[in-house]
Amino acid sequence: MRLIPLKAAAQVGKWAAAHIVKRINEFQPTAERPFVLGLPTGGTPLATYKALIEMHKAGEVSFKHVVTFNMDEYVGLAADHPESYRSFMYNNFFNHIDIQEENINLLNGNTDDHEAECKRYEDKIKSYGKINLFMGGVGNDGHIAFNEPASSLSSRTRIKTLTEDTRIANSRFFDGDINQVPKYALTIGVGTLLDAQEIMILVTGHNKALALQAAVEGSVNHLWTVSALQLHPKAVIVCDEPSTQELKVKTVKYFTELEAKNIVGF
C-alpha cells in the first residue's frame, strides 16, 4: 500500500487528479479499448473533480474514451433530485468534460427490482474486464462506498441499510434534516472494489483520522471496511495532514520519505 501524505485537502485533490490523468494518458484509450474509471461522490472528491475539469479544459486529458462506474446511489431518491448522486456527478463533473453519455454508468435507485439492478451493474463491469482505477473516499467510521461497518469484505453490489451515523453525516446535504436522508442505498461491494486494477482512496480532515489509522496501521477487520485495502496489490491512499493525527509519527515519516519525489510540486 502507498500512502501519499500532503499538507492540505486542496493538495490531495490536485494530486489525485494528476494521478488519474497520468493513468488515462499512459493507457492511451480508444473506442475499442476504453479506460474504465470508478468514481465516488461526497465532499472529499470535489477538489479532484474541479482539478480534472481544469486539466481537461487545458487540453491535458480527454474523457472521450473513458467509461465510468459510480460507487453508489440512494434508494428512492428521484434521479433529478438535487442530492441524488446522478445529479451530483453531472453538476460537478460530467457536464464539464467530453465524456460520452453512453459511457456513464450509474446505479438506478428507483428500480422495482434492486437485486436485478445490482446484478446488471456487476455484469456491466465484468463486460469491460475490470475497472482500471477506482477512486473513493472513506467515512468517519471507515466505510467505503456504503459498505458500513461489519460488511462482508467479499461483498458484491447490493442494497444496504445506512447507519444512523452515516445518515447524520449526510444530512448536511439535506438542510441538516436526517429525516430527508434515504435509509437505503445501492452500493458496490468491498469485493467489487478489490477487483479493480488500482484503488485510490482520498482521506481529508481530522474526523477521518481513526479511519486512516485503521486502514494503515490496523488489522484487516470488517468493522473498518477501509482496512480491506491492505489485501489489494495496488492501493494508494492520498491524505492531508489533519487526517494523519492518529498515525504514529514514524509511520508518517516513513511514507513522507518514501514518496518524497512524488510529493514535490504539490
Curated annotation (Swiss-Prot):
SUPFAM superfamilies: NagB/RpiA/CoA transferase-like. The active site is at D72, D141, H143, E148. Signal peptide: none annotated. Pfam families: Glucosamine_iso (PF01182). It comes from the Bacteria. GO terms for cellular component: cytoplasm. It catalyses: alpha-D-glucosamine 6-phosphate + H2O = beta-D-fructose 6-phosphate + NH4(+). The record marks S151, R158, K160, T161, Y254 as: Part of the allosteric site. Allosterically activated by N-acetylglucosamine 6-phosphate (GlcNAc6P). PROSITE patterns: GLC_GALNAC_ISOMERASE (PS01161). Its EC number is 3.5.99.6. PANTHER family: GLUCOSAMINE-6-PHOSPHATE ISOMERASE. Catalyzes the reversible isomerization-deamination of glucosamine 6-phosphate (GlcN6P) to form fructose 6-phosphate (Fru6P) and ammonium ion. This is Glucosamine-6-phosphate deaminase. It comes from Vibrio cholerae serotype O1 (strain ATCC 39315 / El Tor Inaba N16961). The lineage of its organism: Bacteria, Pseudomonadati, Pseudomonadota, Gammaproteobacteria, Vibrionales.
